[in-house]
Protein backbone atom coordinates (compact mmCIF):
# COMPACT_ATOMS: atom_id res chain seq x y z
CA UNK A 1 0.00 0.00 0.00
CA UNK A 2 0.90 3.66 0.20
CA UNK A 3 3.42 5.09 2.59
CA UNK A 4 2.22 6.05 6.05
CA UNK A 5 4.05 8.58 8.20
CA UNK A 6 5.87 7.09 11.19
CA UNK A 7 5.26 9.16 14.32
CA UNK A 8 7.92 9.11 17.03
CA UNK A 9 10.77 7.69 14.94
CA UNK A 10 14.14 8.56 16.48
CA UNK A 11 16.72 10.19 14.26
CA UNK A 12 20.34 10.68 15.22
CA UNK A 13 22.65 12.89 13.14
CA UNK A 14 26.37 12.11 13.43
CA UNK A 15 29.21 14.39 12.32
CA UNK A 16 32.21 13.10 10.28
CA UNK A 17 33.96 12.14 13.55
CA UNK A 18 30.98 9.99 14.57
CA UNK A 19 29.79 12.30 17.37
CA UNK A 20 26.05 12.78 17.76
CA UNK A 21 25.11 16.40 16.92
CA UNK A 22 21.30 16.11 16.96
CA UNK A 23 18.70 13.68 18.25
CA UNK A 24 15.30 14.33 16.68
CA UNK A 25 11.84 12.75 16.79
CA UNK A 26 9.31 12.69 13.94
CA UNK A 27 5.94 14.46 14.29
CA UNK A 28 2.47 13.33 13.14
CA UNK A 29 3.47 13.98 9.49
CA UNK A 30 6.51 11.74 9.91
CA UNK A 31 8.82 14.75 9.64
CA UNK A 32 11.40 16.35 11.93
CA UNK A 33 12.16 20.01 12.54
CA UNK A 34 14.77 21.61 10.28
CA UNK A 35 18.25 21.79 11.78
CA UNK A 36 21.39 23.71 10.83
CA UNK A 37 24.69 21.89 10.34
CA UNK A 38 28.21 23.18 9.82
CA UNK A 39 29.73 22.73 6.39
CA UNK A 40 32.29 24.01 3.88
CA UNK A 41 32.32 27.30 1.99
CA UNK A 42 29.73 27.28 -0.79
CA UNK A 43 32.16 28.70 -3.38
CA UNK A 44 34.22 25.48 -3.34
CA UNK A 45 31.39 23.62 -5.11
CA UNK A 46 31.48 26.18 -7.93
CA UNK A 47 35.19 25.59 -8.65
CA UNK A 48 35.92 22.77 -11.15
CA UNK A 49 39.59 22.75 -10.07
CA UNK A 50 38.87 22.15 -6.37
CA UNK A 51 39.96 18.56 -5.76
CA UNK A 52 38.56 18.11 -2.24
CA UNK A 53 34.97 17.39 -1.25
CA UNK A 54 33.13 20.76 -1.21
CA UNK A 55 30.57 19.73 1.41
CA UNK A 56 30.46 18.04 4.79
CA UNK A 57 28.97 14.54 4.87
CA UNK A 58 26.89 13.60 7.92
CA UNK A 59 25.58 10.16 8.86
CA UNK A 60 21.94 9.66 9.84
CA UNK A 61 20.51 6.76 11.86
CA UNK A 62 16.72 6.30 11.82
CA UNK A 63 15.00 3.94 14.28
CA UNK A 64 11.34 3.22 15.06
CA UNK A 65 9.67 0.48 17.09
CA UNK A 66 8.55 -2.44 14.92
CA UNK A 67 10.64 -1.34 11.92
CA UNK A 68 14.08 -2.17 10.60
CA UNK A 69 16.53 0.69 11.10
CA UNK A 70 18.08 2.81 8.36
CA UNK A 71 21.66 4.10 8.32
CA UNK A 72 22.47 6.72 5.69
CA UNK A 73 26.12 7.60 5.37
CA UNK A 74 27.54 10.67 3.65
CA UNK A 75 24.45 12.92 3.64
CA UNK A 76 25.84 15.98 1.81
CA UNK A 77 25.31 19.35 3.49
CA UNK A 78 26.07 22.52 1.50
CA UNK A 79 26.19 26.08 2.75
CA UNK A 80 22.76 27.79 2.41
CA UNK A 81 21.14 24.70 0.87
CA UNK A 82 18.23 22.80 2.40
CA UNK A 83 18.83 19.05 2.20
CA UNK A 84 15.78 16.79 2.41
CA UNK A 85 16.44 13.21 3.52
CA UNK A 86 13.63 10.75 2.82
CA UNK A 87 13.63 7.73 5.14
CA UNK A 88 11.59 4.71 4.17
CA UNK A 89 11.54 2.15 6.98
CA UNK A 90 10.59 -1.46 6.32
CA UNK A 91 8.44 -3.23 8.94
CA UNK A 92 10.14 -6.05 10.85
CA UNK A 93 9.03 -9.57 9.93
CA UNK A 94 7.22 -11.54 12.63
CA UNK A 95 10.13 -14.01 12.74
CA UNK A 96 12.67 -11.24 13.51
CA UNK A 97 13.90 -10.93 17.08
CA UNK A 98 15.67 -7.60 16.59
CA UNK A 99 15.71 -4.94 13.86
CA UNK A 100 18.14 -5.19 10.95
CA UNK A 101 19.94 -2.09 9.69
CA UNK A 102 19.48 -1.19 6.02
CA UNK A 103 22.28 1.01 4.70
CA UNK A 104 22.42 3.71 2.04
CA UNK A 105 25.76 5.25 1.07
CA UNK A 106 25.81 8.58 -0.72
CA UNK A 107 28.90 9.24 -2.82
CA UNK A 108 29.99 12.58 -4.28
CA UNK A 109 27.98 13.59 -7.37
CA UNK A 110 28.86 12.16 -10.78
CA UNK A 111 30.11 15.60 -11.91
CA UNK A 112 32.94 15.16 -9.39
CA UNK A 113 33.81 11.54 -10.20
CA UNK A 114 35.80 10.15 -13.11
CA UNK A 115 33.33 7.48 -14.23
CA UNK A 116 33.54 6.91 -17.99
CA UNK A 117 30.23 7.56 -19.73
CA UNK A 118 29.09 5.09 -22.36
CA UNK A 119 25.57 6.42 -22.85
CA UNK A 120 24.54 4.66 -26.06
CA UNK A 121 22.52 6.57 -28.61
CA UNK A 122 19.45 4.80 -30.00
CA UNK A 123 19.12 4.20 -33.73
CA UNK A 124 16.30 6.30 -35.22
CA UNK A 125 14.30 3.25 -36.38
CA UNK A 126 14.10 1.56 -32.99
CA UNK A 127 10.65 0.89 -31.55
CA UNK A 128 9.23 4.31 -30.81
CA UNK A 129 6.11 5.38 -28.95
CA UNK A 130 4.06 7.76 -31.07
CA UNK A 131 3.46 10.17 -28.22
CA UNK A 132 5.94 11.57 -25.72
CA UNK A 133 4.63 10.36 -22.39
CA UNK A 134 5.80 10.83 -18.82
CA UNK A 135 6.20 7.43 -17.20
CA UNK A 136 4.73 7.84 -13.73
CA UNK A 137 5.97 5.71 -12.10
CA UNK A 138 9.20 5.10 -14.02
CA UNK A 139 10.78 1.67 -13.52
CA UNK A 140 14.48 1.92 -12.63
CA UNK A 141 16.91 -1.03 -12.64
CA UNK A 142 19.32 -0.54 -9.72
CA UNK A 143 22.46 -1.64 -11.54
CA UNK A 144 23.98 -2.08 -14.99
CA UNK A 145 21.53 -3.38 -17.64
CA UNK A 146 22.34 -7.11 -17.47
CA UNK A 147 22.99 -7.27 -13.71
CA UNK A 148 20.54 -9.13 -11.46
CA UNK A 149 19.79 -5.98 -9.44
CA UNK A 150 16.28 -5.09 -8.27
CA UNK A 151 13.82 -2.92 -10.20
CA UNK A 152 12.04 -0.11 -8.35
CA UNK A 153 9.04 1.98 -9.38
CA UNK A 154 9.53 5.66 -8.64
CA UNK A 155 7.34 8.72 -9.15
CA UNK A 156 8.77 10.54 -12.17
CA UNK A 157 9.37 13.82 -10.31
CA UNK A 158 11.11 11.97 -7.46
CA UNK A 159 13.27 10.14 -10.00
CA UNK A 160 14.40 13.39 -11.68
CA UNK A 161 15.10 15.07 -8.31
CA UNK A 162 17.18 12.07 -7.27
CA UNK A 163 19.18 11.96 -10.52
CA UNK A 164 19.89 15.71 -10.47
CA UNK A 165 20.97 15.48 -6.80
CA UNK A 166 23.21 12.50 -7.73
CA UNK A 167 24.70 14.12 -10.84
CA UNK A 168 25.47 17.77 -10.01
CA UNK A 169 25.94 20.24 -7.15
CA UNK A 170 22.75 21.95 -5.87
CA UNK A 171 24.72 25.20 -5.36
CA UNK A 172 25.19 25.79 -9.09
CA UNK A 173 23.55 28.88 -10.68
CA UNK A 174 19.85 28.58 -11.50
CA UNK A 175 20.36 28.54 -15.31
CA UNK A 176 22.98 25.81 -14.93
CA UNK A 177 20.67 23.69 -12.72
CA UNK A 178 17.84 24.11 -15.22
CA UNK A 179 19.98 23.20 -18.25
CA UNK A 180 21.20 20.05 -16.49
CA UNK A 181 17.69 19.13 -15.33
CA UNK A 182 16.32 19.56 -18.88
CA UNK A 183 19.05 17.19 -20.10
CA UNK A 184 18.24 14.66 -17.34
CA UNK A 185 14.46 14.75 -18.00
CA UNK A 186 15.00 14.46 -21.76
CA UNK A 187 17.49 11.61 -21.44
CA UNK A 188 14.94 9.61 -19.41
CA UNK A 189 12.07 10.43 -21.80
CA UNK A 190 14.27 9.39 -24.76
CA UNK A 191 14.89 5.99 -23.13
CA UNK A 192 11.12 5.58 -22.64
CA UNK A 193 10.13 6.96 -26.07
CA UNK A 194 12.56 4.68 -27.95
CA UNK A 195 11.73 1.76 -25.64
CA UNK A 196 15.51 1.31 -25.47
CA UNK A 197 15.44 -1.37 -22.76
CA UNK A 198 11.91 -2.74 -23.13
CA UNK A 199 12.48 -3.48 -26.85
CA UNK A 200 15.41 -5.68 -25.76
CA UNK A 201 13.16 -7.70 -23.46
CA UNK A 202 14.07 -5.97 -20.20
CA UNK A 203 11.27 -5.15 -17.73
CA UNK A 204 12.49 -1.62 -16.90
CA UNK A 205 12.67 1.84 -18.50
CA UNK A 206 16.17 2.95 -17.46
CA UNK A 207 19.07 1.89 -15.22
CA UNK A 208 20.71 3.63 -12.27
CA UNK A 209 24.10 3.11 -13.93
CA UNK A 210 26.03 6.38 -14.27
CA UNK A 211 27.98 4.84 -17.15
CA UNK A 212 25.03 3.59 -19.24
CA UNK A 213 22.34 6.10 -18.28
CA UNK A 214 22.35 8.59 -15.39
CA UNK A 215 23.10 8.34 -11.68
CA UNK A 216 20.26 7.31 -9.36
CA UNK A 217 20.73 6.37 -5.69
CA UNK A 218 17.56 4.89 -4.21
CA UNK A 219 16.65 6.68 -0.97
CA UNK A 220 19.28 9.41 -1.23
CA UNK A 221 19.19 13.04 -0.03
CA UNK A 222 17.62 15.56 -2.39
CA UNK A 223 18.04 19.33 -2.37
CA UNK A 224 15.39 22.03 -2.24
CA UNK A 225 16.99 24.15 -5.00
CA UNK A 226 16.74 21.16 -7.37
CA UNK A 227 13.36 19.98 -6.08
CA UNK A 228 11.74 23.37 -6.69
CA UNK A 229 12.91 23.50 -10.32
CA UNK A 230 11.83 19.90 -11.04
CA UNK A 231 8.30 20.58 -9.74
CA UNK A 232 8.12 23.45 -12.21
CA UNK A 233 9.58 21.85 -15.39
CA UNK A 234 9.26 18.05 -15.04
CA UNK A 235 7.03 17.79 -18.13
CA UNK A 236 9.30 19.87 -20.38
CA UNK A 237 11.94 18.31 -22.61
CA UNK A 238 14.43 19.07 -25.38
CA UNK A 239 13.57 18.25 -29.00
CA UNK A 240 14.58 19.43 -32.47
CA UNK A 241 12.15 21.92 -33.98
CA UNK A 242 9.64 20.08 -36.14
CA UNK A 243 10.27 16.76 -34.38
CA UNK A 244 8.34 15.21 -31.53
CA UNK A 245 11.00 12.84 -30.22
CA UNK A 246 12.99 13.78 -27.11
CA UNK A 247 16.52 14.62 -28.28
CA UNK A 248 19.29 12.25 -27.12
CA UNK A 249 20.75 14.61 -24.49
CA UNK A 250 23.99 12.83 -23.58
CA UNK A 251 26.25 14.52 -21.03
CA UNK A 252 29.46 14.11 -19.03
CA UNK A 253 31.28 16.10 -16.36
CA UNK A 254 33.47 18.05 -18.80
CA UNK A 255 36.55 17.89 -16.55
CA UNK A 256 37.89 14.33 -16.25
CA UNK A 257 35.68 13.22 -19.16
CA UNK A 258 34.75 14.99 -22.36
CA UNK A 259 31.99 14.01 -24.74
CA UNK A 260 29.98 15.26 -27.69
CA UNK A 261 27.10 16.16 -25.36
CA UNK A 262 26.62 18.62 -22.53
CA UNK A 263 29.49 19.41 -20.16
CA UNK A 264 28.11 19.58 -16.61
CA UNK A 265 30.88 21.88 -15.33
CA UNK A 266 30.74 23.88 -18.56
CA UNK A 267 27.15 24.88 -17.79
CA UNK A 268 28.38 26.64 -14.64
CA UNK A 269 30.66 29.10 -16.44
CA UNK A 270 28.04 29.68 -19.16
CA UNK A 271 25.40 30.43 -16.51
CA UNK A 272 27.83 32.78 -14.75
CA UNK A 273 28.22 34.60 -18.10
CA UNK A 274 24.46 35.19 -18.12
CA UNK A 275 23.27 32.62 -20.66
CA UNK A 276 19.71 31.28 -20.36
CA UNK A 277 19.07 27.53 -19.93
CA UNK A 278 18.11 27.21 -23.63
CA UNK A 279 21.22 29.13 -24.74
CA UNK A 280 23.34 26.80 -22.58
CA UNK A 281 21.69 23.73 -24.15
CA UNK A 282 22.20 25.12 -27.67
CA UNK A 283 25.88 25.54 -26.85
CA UNK A 284 26.17 21.72 -26.65
CA UNK A 285 23.32 20.38 -28.77
CA UNK A 286 22.15 21.53 -32.25
CA UNK A 287 21.02 25.13 -32.65
CA UNK A 288 17.53 24.10 -33.74
CA UNK A 289 16.57 22.51 -30.43
CA UNK A 290 13.66 23.87 -28.42
CA UNK A 291 11.93 23.16 -25.13
CA UNK A 292 8.61 21.36 -25.60
CA UNK A 293 6.15 20.07 -23.05
CA UNK A 294 3.90 17.04 -22.74
CA UNK A 295 0.81 16.62 -20.59
CA UNK A 296 0.48 12.90 -21.33
CA UNK A 297 1.11 10.62 -18.37
CA UNK A 298 1.21 6.86 -18.46
CA UNK A 299 1.04 4.41 -15.59
CA UNK A 300 -1.02 6.64 -13.32
CA UNK A 301 -3.37 3.70 -12.82
CA UNK A 302 -0.63 1.50 -11.40
CA UNK A 303 -0.02 4.04 -8.65
CA UNK A 304 -3.76 4.32 -7.98
CA UNK A 305 -4.28 3.96 -4.23
CA UNK A 306 -7.15 1.48 -4.53
CA UNK A 307 -9.83 3.77 -3.13
CA UNK A 308 -11.34 6.77 -4.92
CA UNK A 309 -9.95 10.09 -3.71
CA UNK A 310 -12.64 12.37 -2.32
CA UNK A 311 -13.06 15.33 0.00
CA UNK A 312 -11.21 14.54 3.22
CA UNK A 313 -8.68 12.17 1.58
CA UNK A 314 -5.08 12.80 2.62
CA UNK A 315 -1.62 11.73 1.60
CA UNK A 316 0.87 11.43 -1.23
CA UNK A 317 -1.76 10.33 -3.76
CA UNK A 318 -3.63 13.60 -3.21
CA UNK A 319 -0.39 15.57 -3.48
CA UNK A 320 0.43 13.90 -6.83
CA UNK A 321 -2.92 15.02 -8.23
CA UNK A 322 -2.53 18.55 -6.83
CA UNK A 323 0.94 18.86 -8.43
CA UNK A 324 -0.44 17.77 -11.81
CA UNK A 325 -3.49 20.02 -11.66
CA UNK A 326 -1.41 23.05 -10.71
CA UNK A 327 0.90 22.30 -13.63
CA UNK A 328 -1.95 21.81 -16.13
CA UNK A 329 -3.62 25.02 -14.86
CA UNK A 330 -0.89 27.06 -16.54
CA UNK A 331 -2.18 25.94 -19.93
CA UNK A 332 -5.83 25.60 -18.90
CA UNK A 333 -6.58 28.66 -16.75
CA UNK A 334 -10.23 27.58 -16.46
CA UNK A 335 -9.09 25.06 -13.84
CA UNK A 336 -9.42 26.88 -10.50
CA UNK A 337 -6.41 27.35 -8.25
CA UNK A 338 -5.88 24.82 -5.45
CA UNK A 339 -5.59 26.58 -2.09
CA UNK A 340 -5.80 23.45 0.08
CA UNK A 341 -2.79 22.32 2.06
CA UNK A 342 -0.53 19.94 0.08
CA UNK A 343 -1.81 16.37 0.41
CA UNK A 344 -5.24 17.40 1.72
CA UNK A 345 -8.26 16.92 -0.57
CA UNK A 346 -10.38 19.95 0.31
CA UNK A 347 -13.02 21.99 -1.53
CA UNK A 348 -10.60 23.76 -3.88
CA UNK A 349 -8.99 20.44 -4.89
CA UNK A 350 -12.45 19.01 -5.58
CA UNK A 351 -13.35 22.07 -7.69
CA UNK A 352 -10.11 21.72 -9.68
CA UNK A 353 -10.65 17.98 -10.25
CA UNK A 354 -14.26 18.54 -11.37
CA UNK A 355 -13.24 21.28 -13.82
CA UNK A 356 -10.32 19.19 -15.12
CA UNK A 357 -12.70 16.27 -15.74
CA UNK A 358 -15.09 18.49 -17.67
CA UNK A 359 -12.31 20.21 -19.68
CA UNK A 360 -10.90 16.82 -20.70
CA UNK A 361 -14.32 15.10 -21.03
CA UNK A 362 -13.49 12.55 -18.36
CA UNK A 363 -16.79 12.56 -16.48
Descriptions of predicted regions:
Residues 19-46, 332-334:
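Short, acidic Ser/Thr/Gly-rich low-complexity loop/linker segments typical of extracellular
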Residues 1-2, 44:
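Short amphipathic, basic-aromatic surface patches that mediate peripheral association
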Residues 25-27, 51-55, 78-80:
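Surface-exposed coil/turn segments at beta-strand junctions on protein surfaces, enriched
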Residues 8-12, 35-37, 61-363:
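Conserved, single-site charged/polar hotspot
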Residues 42-73:
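A short, solvent-exposed loop/turn motif at the edges and junctions
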Residues 2-28, 318:
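Short, ordered, surface-exposed loop/turn motifs in non-cytosolic proteins
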Residues 1, 27-29, 342, 363:
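Acidic/polar residues in short coil/turn loops that connect beta-strands
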Residues 4-6, 17-19, 53-55, 131-133, ...:
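Short, surface-exposed loop/turn motifs at beta-strand boundaries within globular domains
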Amino acid sequence: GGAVPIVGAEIRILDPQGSSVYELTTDESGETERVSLETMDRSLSLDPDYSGTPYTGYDVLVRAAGFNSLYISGVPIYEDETAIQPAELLPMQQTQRSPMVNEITIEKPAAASDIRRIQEKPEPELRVLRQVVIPDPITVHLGSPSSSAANVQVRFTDYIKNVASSEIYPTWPDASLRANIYAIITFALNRVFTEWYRSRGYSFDITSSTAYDQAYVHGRTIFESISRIVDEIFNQYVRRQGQNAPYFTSFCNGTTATCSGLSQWGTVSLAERGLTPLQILRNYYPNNIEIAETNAVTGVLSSYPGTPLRTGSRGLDVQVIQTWLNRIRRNYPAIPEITDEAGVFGDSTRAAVTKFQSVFNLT
